């Protein structure tokens, strides 16, 4: 069985399990949205999934109620919890707040959503992230640069490098990629 067939089989099994097991369904909501959005926007599933793992991966799955406030991660218990924490952070003057499965930054991208609650919706969150990553790929002509820019702006090379290396490590850990000589050299 080829690696590609194995991945499809695993993703199919995950989708089947998610549709038949309510406990898994809530835990795998981000992953299901990733499979759909990756196909819609022509993004290799492994890349979008590895970006998600880098952003909110915890205990083997992505977290729809994750947030990051000014560099400090918080994993909420539900949407009400996260929205309350969001409101508290904004009242304290926090500007850099990332929300949801793919950690969409409210300050830079919030205008594309009707509300912070909408940003936490796994479908909207992952869909927006996939479209954004696809646009970055078109602009920068490589997935590596798209991933780098997803996390940090053009003037933050150290953060971009660290992030790209974390995404590559997640690609390798999940079986979607392997360490190439160039990647190994780059991530030293």
Each model region followed by its residue ranges:
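Catalytic glycan-binding domains that act on GlcNAc-containing polysaccharides
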Residues: 26-188
């Amino acid at each position: 069985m080829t690696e590609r067939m194995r991945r499809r089989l695993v993703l199919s099994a995950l989708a089947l399990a998610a549709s038949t097991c309510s406990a898994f369904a809530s835990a795998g909501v981000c992953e299901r949205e990733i499979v759909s959005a990756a196909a819609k926007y022509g993004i290799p599933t492994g890349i979008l999934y590895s970006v998600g793992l880098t952003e909110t991966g915890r205990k083997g799955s992505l977290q729809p109620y994750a947030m990051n406030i000014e560099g400090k991660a918080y994993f909420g218990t539900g949407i009400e919890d996260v929205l309350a924490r969001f409101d508290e952070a904004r009242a304290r003057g926090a500007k850099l707040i990332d929300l949801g499965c793919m950690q969409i930054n409210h300050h830079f991208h919030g205008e594309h959503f009707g509300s912070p609650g909408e940003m936490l919706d796994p479908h909207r969150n992952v869909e927006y992230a996939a479209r954004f990553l696809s646009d970055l790929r078109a602009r920068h002509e490589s997935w590596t640069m798209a991933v780098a820019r997803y996390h940090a702006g053009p003037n933050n090379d150290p953060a971009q490098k660290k992030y790209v290396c974390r995404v590559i490590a997640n690609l390798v850990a999940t079986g979607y990629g392997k360490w190439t000589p160039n990647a190994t050299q780059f991530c030293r």
